[in-house]
Design a protein with these regions (language model features):
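Residues that mark the start of a beta-strand
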Residues: 7-9, 132, 163
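A short glycine-threonine-serine/GTX helix/turn-capping micro-motif
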Residues: 163-169
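Extended, subdomain-level signal for the structured scaffold at the beginning of enzyme domains
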Residues: 1-112, 120-124, 141-146, 152-155, ...
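Divalent-metal (often Zn2+) His-rich catalytic cores of metallo-beta-lactamase-fold enzymes
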Residues: 172
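Short, well-ordered alpha-helix to beta-strand connector turns
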Residues: 78, 109, 130-131, 161
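FMN-binding flavodoxin-like domain, especially the glycine-rich phosphate-binding loop
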Residues: 134, 154-159
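Short, glycine-/small-residue-rich phosphate/pyrophosphate-handling segment
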Residues: 127-145
Length: 211
């Protein structure tokens, strides 16, 4: 059986010191979501690209570097924004110019997602004020200080607040991404993506063994 479905663009916001799995876990989940098109070929449901303050090399906290294809300002239109966490968030939250650019990037997206301490960055923009959110439990005390008006939820693998999804630490971003795939394309598609990754999906948003 062939299908047709819109291809959604995912923009990944990179910064110095991001956590590798925060980015590439969700990216793999999105990339593992495919359908068989009218031509009989497997077609992606998501188109993914990276961006940063400036296009070019961006070093992860764990060492390997990634390549930002676009600057925030020159990036093409996108539907979903992915904001990772990492030790680099400690410097990024103090960079007001970066925070403002991230706020603009979030407003461009239909859906903004954060992984781990990426929610601290979004909190600094003010766009999480009055909204439920979660984050990494090890860095919890620091994160909540970045957004005193945020309705922080400690026991949550991820929190879905419509156009904003936030996840707990590191690997939780994969579960969050799969939940978004389920919302957009059905639970069977999300389970297929998880199976393609040989990943055991925590399907419950409150299934948080680390809280």
């Amino acid at each position: 059986m062939t299908e047709t479905a819109p291809v959604r663009r995912v923009a990944v916001a990179l910064f110095e010191g991001f956590t590798v799995l925060d980015v590439y876990g969700p990216v793999q989940a999105f990339a593992s979501s495919r359908i068989v098109g009218p031509d009989g070929k497997r077609q992606p449901l998501f188109e993914i690209f990276s961006m940063a303050g400036e296009a070019g090399r961006v070093k992860a906290g764990e060492g390997p570097a990634s390549w930002a294809e676009w600057s925030f300002e020159k990036a093409p239109d996108y539907d979903i924004l992915l904001i990772p966490g990492g030790f680099g968030t400690r410097a990024a939250v103090a960079d007001q110019a970066f925070v403002e650019r991230l706020a603009t990037a979030s407003r461009r997206a239909r859906i903004t997602t954060t992984v781990c301490t990426g929610s601290a960055l979004l909190a600094r923009t003010g766009l999480l004020d009055g909204r439920p959110a979660t984050s990494n439990k090890i860095a919890w005390d620091w994160v909540v200080q970045q957004g005193p008006r945020v309705l922080w939820k400690r026991k949550a693998r991820w929190v879905d607040d419509g156009d904003v999804l936030t996840s707990s630490g590191v690997s939780a971003g994969i579960d969050m991404a799969l939940s978004l795939i389920a919302r957009l394309h059905g639970r069977d598609m999300a389970r297929t993506a998880a199976r393609n990754m040989e990943y055991v999906w925590h399907e419950g948003a409150d299934d948080d063994p680390f809280a």
